[in-house]
Every structure is written in structure tokens, then in C-alpha cells.
């Protein structure tokens, strides 16, 4: 289906996420002990979106990939661009060859993450703490997500427009992160009354 965003005059074509990517589950064998026994220089990512759990002596992926957490704080998407592996708490979305140079990975991340987060299942934490939610590839496939891809006047995917939209979302994200850091520093300020 093709539709036009009236406000921005951008024409879009809806494409099924199930056509765009393959979901590849991580290896359950990459436990902390296994990683300890096979130490090396290549990161292994788990449910945590910020830091690898360990470094091992080989890698399963080499390049830029979308990955998402399946357990814990499920549905957050990270872009990893290196030689790396993932364990069973994470999934890689590999862009299929038909879409490889036609879909911007950052555009896909910003479009998908709110959908993933709104479809997670499990225990939500209080005030963003102690969340334990799940979202696996089977759940995502069943959603049959339609991704609106900007197209040019001749109907081809508009990679530049995707990048432009993604960069606007990235700027908003960076502003939000800056505000969060400022709020954290304000909360930590201790006011000591002077001895009057």
C-alpha cells in the first residue's frame, strides 16, 4: 500500500517487516562460564543494551546489524557495527539482500523500537526499575508490522529521505538523553542548611 503524509508531502510504501529482515536468535551456549573459558577480544551481547557481558575468542557477526533484547527490558533496539556475538537473551535482525542498500538501519530502529516496546509481555518495574519483560522473534513476526518506507516519484525507496527522518529522531533522542542527565545531576544535589 502507498500513502502520502499530507503535512510533509512524503510518499510512503508500506512493506512487511517480515520481508525486510530475518530474525536470528542468539546462542544459548554463550553463558558467563563459557565466555570465561573462551576469553578473547570479541564482544558478546546479552539483554543489556549498553555493555557486552564478556569478550570471547571468535565472533558470529561482522558488520552493522540491528539487535534487540528479548528478556529483561525487552524490545530495546541497538545497532552494533563490529565483530560480535549475541547470547540467547538477544536477537539479530539481518536485513535481507533485496533491501540491504535500500533501507536505512537507523530509520528502521527508530520506527520499530516503540512498536517493540509496546508489545513486550511481562512484569513492568516501578519507576523504570526491576522490569522483566519478554519479546521474542515469534511474537514480532505475528504482529505483521508494516514499515512505511519513503519513496521517490518513480516509486523507488528514498534512502536519503529515510536518513533525513532518522537523523531528526536521533537529534530528539540526544536532547532527551541530555535532559535525563541534567535531571539526574539535579536530583543528586544536596542542600545543606547553613547554621543560623
Where are these regions (language model features)?
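Non-catalytic DNA-recognition/assembly elements of restriction-modification systems
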Residues: 1-49, 152-196
